[in-house]
Structure formats: C-alpha cells, structure tokens
C-alpha cells in the first residue's frame, strides 16, 4: 500500500510538473528569487501577483507579439531580460524592438495614419497625450481597464502609485497611456570643483557672489564664463564651463520642445503645464481643448521675446563656452563627451543617463572617484529672466505604454499583459535600480534607494522632493505632436548655421506652426478628425496688443539680472525638510 502511494505520488508530481500552470509557477519562483529583488512586495505577494499573470495569460499562451520603444538602458533591460521572464512565466513570446526616438514616433504616426497594426503596443512619450486624446486612435485605458480589458487588468496595478499619471491624462480626465519610465532634465555640475576653496574665492572676487548651484540663467552664464575664460585649466586639463549640442538634426527639435522656452520663462503659470500658454508657445484657453495659435499675433508665445532670448542664449553659450566642435554635435555625440571630465556644468541634462555617468573609472568615466562615487551632482534647472513662481521649471520624459484600436483585441490584451508585467510591483523596483528611471513613488522611497542614494548624484533626493512636480512633459496644448515637432529642428537648425537670426527663426517657426494648425482646423471642422478639439485659430492682432496683456506672451524684460546661486548641500536640506 505504501509502495502504491509512493508510485501514485510520483505520477501525480510528474503530471503537475509537466502542466503549464505548474511550470509557470516554478519559473515565476525562480525569477522572483534570482532576479526580481529587491521589491516593495514580500515574496509571497510577488508569487500571488505572478499567479494572476499565469491565469490571465492562459488564453494567449503560445502567441507571439511585437512591441516597440526607444533605446535607453531601461528598455534594453525590458527587451533582453523581461521578455524572457514573461515568456517563461506566461508562455507568451514578446519581440521588444529598440529604435531611436524619432523612428518610434514615425512608427506611431504610420500606424495612426494607415490603421495597419505594425506593433501590438508602443512605449511612446507622453508628449503625444494631446495627440492621442484628440485623434481617439489610441485606447482610452480608463475605459479599457473597466470594460473590454478588465479580465486582463492587474488588480494590484495601483495607478495612484505612478508619479506620472497626470502626464498621461487627457483633457477628458481619462488615462491614455501607462508610464513605463520617467526621467527629468536637470542641471548637472562638478560638485568637487564647486567645493574648492580657491575656485570659490576667485569666483566671488570676480562676480561678487558665491559659486554654487545657479538659480537663474545669469548665474549659469557667469559660471560658464568663469570656468571657460578665467579658470581654463584644472589639474593640467583644459576645461569648459558649458556643454550642449547644435547639429541640424531631429534631436535638436526636442532639445527645444523639451521645455527650453519654459525654462527661460516663456509660458504661463500652471502645473503640470502652463495655462493658457504652454512650453511650445501654443495658446489654449483654460477649460477648452482648442489651441488658438503659436504666434504672438494670435496670443501665442513661440516668437515672443522670451522664446527669442532662449534660442539666442542656446546659440551664444554653445559658441562661447562649450568645447570645440560641440556646435556640430548631435545629442548622441554630446553624451559621451561629458564623461571625459572636462566640463564644469550642463544646463540641459537628462537623468536617464545617470547609469552611464556612474560607470566605473576604469571604463573611461572621468567623473567618478576611485571608489566609484560621483564627483558631480544633479540639481534643479536654473530659470531665465521671464520665469515666474508657479511655472514649470523643466522637462520630464514619461515613456508610456500606448495601445491602439487598430490592434486586434486578442493581441492587444496579450500586449497589455506584458506592459503591466514590466511595471508591476514585482518587477518595477529592480527595473528602476537597473535603468534609474523611476515611475512608482513606492519604489523611489524604498530603503534600497536610501542606501544607494550617495552613489547616484542627487537622483533619489530629487525624486523624493516636492520640487519634482515642476518638471513635466509636453502637455495637451500640442494637438498633433508628430506634425508639429519636425518644424522645430528645421527652423532652429538655421540659427546654428547662421542663415537666420533667433528672431527670424522663431518668426518662421511660429508662422509655420500656425499654418499646420490651420490645416488641422479645416480637417477637424470638416470631419471631426481631432474629435472637435482641433485648433481654432484666433484672428491676428498686433504684437503690442498681446504683449500688453497680462501673462504670456510677455514683453521684453531686463535679460541680465543679478546672478543668484544656492549651496547644493543647503538645497538638499531644504528638500529633506519638506
């Protein structure tokens, strides 16, 4: 009898171990123990979450789906590691393709225009929220999660834990995208140089105030001049006070649309985006969904004094204070240049590259010490002379999962499962430690990040601070991101080449944006292409009329006020006390 029990037990164990559910659970346990640590969940909670994925994925087992994102370390981890984990646990194979940001936007635009299902899901910048909420070609996730997609929506998804949910919410209050990664554009500087007594003394003697984190652009300019002109060499190395790029290429467009005009102070007050004028200089009155213009003559600010000032300073600093050749660099060439260790500060630096800037010294990174601790820090972006309290202070990227109605429902459901897997609490904390692009408030406040904070140059302190809300992506004023974005690099690239002055370039840009929006208006009025929320351009009025109205667009001000700085350590204490 005991022998029979033993035989039957062995048969039962064999049957269970060969069943899909048992295999999935075993694989889930392996991934939980070996890869998905640390987590904000206990291991038993992680197992319960993975059990849900196994059951919800059963109807799609054996399916092969395709998703697309841009190429940053976070998405490389998803493409190489998380696809493998997901397939072993659920039986769904995912081809996660990585392309440049411009190519991702092009693929999104092609799927929207043709209705052909190129990919089953995209990690698409939330900069397109105004596009998706108007065209209604993307799936409204609020209704999806409560309706057709409810059977494949993770009960523990916890939308309120996502720091960027406001970025992916349309004017109708519906969620159109699910944040997958976030990174801000902040100020970067050599903390070790700024702490040197000899340099601090020399700076104060020349400029009359303390060397520190610049609060305004006047101070940034003074510091750039100080290191490039007055210091010149540190430890036998020629150093520079500024770093940027200027090549006439698509990435020059997002160099500007990623809130450069708002940093100068060109928009209106309002968070996450200015109302009525946003960071692109596009005006849309409060409580409406119809943009009315980008030109000052229509109440916009794309060619207002603040915008022209912003472009002039970008061009001027690049030529005066950046390393030789920087004006001909594109975005991708400028990044490795910073790790050479010969730049004192950078006003426009994406935190997505924290992981590469904390690489060990032996890998060629000259911005860490022998123990691997950063010699640099990140801090809030300085603001221009047109900026007012209550305005956004910079840009934050929120690459977000986006589903399209043109994707067959079964494939859409399978892709939605993978999307949720990549941001689930089982996975997200480990993914955040790999890519350093936090999406969950619970993750950035975890003890593991408290421990790691000293080696991350201020990233943890920033994301735990109340200041983080002042950095946001492109908002809902932009009615069609792909159509309008391409105008920027083409027009501003002509400033770098010397073909046009900043004023001429911004006049041309504003005029062309209004022209493109007038075509959108015609299409929307004729066939509700933008759901009735397309542009409705204002009639033109004189520049003086609009520049004399309250708020943005703003008349010219003193563009070189007194420089103002703050000590970095004092800044961190201020964050901690809030």
Please provide the spans of the model-predicted regions.
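Glycine-centered hinge/linker elements that transmit conformational signals in sensory
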Residues: 219-225, 262-328, 372, 381
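Short, polar/charged alpha-helical segment
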Residues: 49-56, 73-91, 188, 192-194, ...
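Extracytoplasmic/periplasmic substrate-recognition and gating elements
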Residues: 169, 319-324, 333, 342-345, ...
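Short helix-initiation/N-cap motifs at beta->coil->alpha
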Residues: 99-107, 215-219, 326-339
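Extracytoplasmic "Venus flytrap"/periplasmic binding protein-like
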Residues: 84-162, 196-198, 202-204, 344-345, ...
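Hinge/lid segment of periplasmic solute-binding proteins
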Residues: 25-59, 126-186, 281, 375-381, ...
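Periplasmic solute-binding protein
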Residues: 126-137, 142-146, 162-209, 221, ...
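Long, aromatic- and glycine/proline-rich binding clefts that accommodate carbohydrate-like moieties
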Residues: 50-52, 64, 373-383, 395, ...
């Amino acid at each position: 009898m005991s022998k029979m029990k033993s035989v039957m037990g062995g048969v039962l164990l064999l049957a269970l171990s060969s069943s899909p559910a048992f295999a999935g659970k075993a694989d889930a346990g392996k991934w939980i123990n070996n890869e998905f640590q640390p987590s904000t969940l206990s291991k038993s909670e992680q197992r319960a979450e993975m059990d849900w994925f196994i059951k919800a994925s059963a109807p799609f087992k054996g399916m092969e789906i395709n998703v697309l994102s841009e190429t940053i370390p976070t998405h490389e981890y998803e493409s190489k590691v998380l696809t493998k984990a997901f397939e072993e646990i659920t039986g769904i194979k995912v081809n996660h393709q990585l392309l440049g940001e411009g190519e991702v936007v092009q693929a999104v635009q092609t799927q929207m225009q043709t209705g052909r299902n190129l990919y089953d899901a995209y990690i698409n910048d939330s900069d397109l929220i105004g596009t998706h909420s108007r065209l209604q070609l993307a799936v409204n996730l609020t209704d999806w999660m409560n309706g057709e997609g409810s059977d494949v929506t993770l009960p523990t998804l916890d939308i309120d834990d996502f720091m960027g949910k406001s970025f992916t919410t349309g004017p109708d209050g519906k969620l159109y995208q699910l944040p997958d990664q976030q990174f801000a554009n902040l100020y970067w500087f050599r903390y070790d140089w700024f702490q040197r007594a000899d340099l601090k003394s020399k700076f104060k003697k020349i400029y009359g105030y303390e060397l520190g984190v610049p609060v305004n652009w006047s101070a940034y300019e003074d510091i750039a001049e100080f290191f490039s002109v007055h210091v010149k060499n540190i430890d036998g190395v020629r150093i520079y006070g500024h770093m940027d790029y200027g090549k006439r290429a698509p990435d020059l467009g997002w160099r500007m649309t990623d809130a450069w005009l708002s940093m100068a102070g060109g928009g209106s007050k309002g968070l996450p985006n200015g109302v009525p004028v946003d960071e692109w200089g596009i005006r849309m009155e409060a409580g409406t969904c119809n943009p009315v213009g980008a030109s000052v003559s229509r109440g916009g600010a794309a060619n207002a004094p603040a915008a022209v000032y912003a472009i002039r300073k970008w061009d001027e600093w690049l030529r005066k204070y950046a390393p030789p050749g920087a004006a001909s660099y594109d975005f991708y060439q400028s990044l490795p240049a910073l790790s050479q260790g010969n730049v004192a500060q950078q006003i426009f630096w994406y935190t997505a590259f924290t992981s590469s800037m904390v690489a060990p010294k032996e890998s060629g990174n000259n911005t860490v010490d022998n123990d691997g601790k950063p010699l640099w820090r990140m801090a809030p972006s300085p603001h221009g002379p047109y900026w007012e309290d209550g305005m956004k202070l910079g840009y934050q990227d929120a690459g977000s999962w986006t589903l399209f109605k043109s994707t067959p429902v079964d494939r859409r459901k399978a892709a939605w499962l993978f999307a949720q897997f990549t941001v689930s609490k089982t996975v997200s904390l480990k993914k955040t430690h790999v890519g350093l692009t936090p999406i969950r408030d619970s993750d950035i406040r975890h003890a593991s990040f408290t421990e790691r904070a000293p080696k991350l140059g201020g990233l943890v302190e920033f994301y735990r601070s109340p200041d983080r809300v002042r950095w946001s992506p492109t908002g809902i004023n932009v009615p069609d991101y792909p159509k309008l974005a391409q105008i920027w690099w083409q027009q501003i690239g002509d400033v770098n080449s010397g073909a046009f002055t900043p004023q001429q370039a911004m006049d041309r840009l504003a005029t062309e944006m209004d022209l493109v929006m007038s075509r959108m208006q015609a299409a929307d009025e004729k066939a509700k292409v933008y759901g009735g929320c397309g542009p409705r351009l204002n009639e033109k009025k004189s520049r003086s009329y609009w520049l004399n109205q309250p708020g943005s667009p703003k008349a010219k001000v003193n563009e070189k006020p007194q420089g103002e700085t703050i000590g970095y350590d004092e800044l961190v204490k201020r964050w901690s006390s809030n």
